[in-house]
Amino acid sequence: MSAYEVLVSNITQSFLDHGYEAMTMSKLAKYCNITRRGLYHHFSSKEEAFQAMVRQNNQRTRLGSLSEGTRLLSAGADVLDIVTAVLDVRYGDTRRKLVLSPFALEVNDYAFRLCRPEMVEAATVFQANFAALLQQIIANGQLTLRPTISIETLVQLLCDGARGTNQSFFAPSSEEITARYRQMSQAILFGCAEPAGL
């Protein structure tokens, strides 16, 4: 990790431990073990630091999820295992980290308030990458889409389902979230497609 990535990781932990509203740049510098001047060299405000946190997390989970999906595809895993793993890393890692924070609702609220452009961009890039991975699965003969469903529609449904799982009123615990992604993925996949050869 670069020094900047380490700083943003420390910023992430600081917001999770202390919340957004009461945070100041002075406190953030102290929690990150950096001078205020050093922090201001990178960010002009706590809002910018928070946005950097969201960007880095989105990049980390996007790359990690696609790496895991590609690894499973190469290992010959079935489509449900691949899709579950991709969604679990992309959305579940953040959820598991957030539920440990006493400021989870506050951090989540500010992420939606302050970081919508970053979140939309991350979703757009991830969904295009996820579609490419699913195209490989289809090309391998592991999945056949129904004629009325496009790959983009399938990806949108799966991602909406994962985000909905995270935001549901009866949200699963950290231990249950992988199974919930699997159940949701199975319902969507085999309502939109059928296993190849059937």
Named regions from a protein language model:
Residues 2, 6, 10, 14-48, ...:
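Helix-turn-helix
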Residues 10, 14, 89, 93, ...:
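Amphipathic alpha-helical interface segments
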Residues 17-21, 97, 140:
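Short coil/turn segments at alpha/beta junctions that flank glycine-rich nucleotide-binding fingerprints
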Residues 51-57, 61-64:
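Alpha-helical DNA-contacting segments of helix-turn-helix folds
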Residues 52, 66-96, 151, 155-158, ...:
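Hydrophobic alpha-helical connector segments
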Residues 69-72, 101-108, 165-172:
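Secondary-structure edge/capping motif, primarily at the C-terminal ends of alpha-helices
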Residues 88-131, 142-143:
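Short secondary-structure transition hinges
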Residues 112, 123-158, 192-197:
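Hydrophobic alpha-helical bundle segments that form small-molecule/ligand-binding pockets
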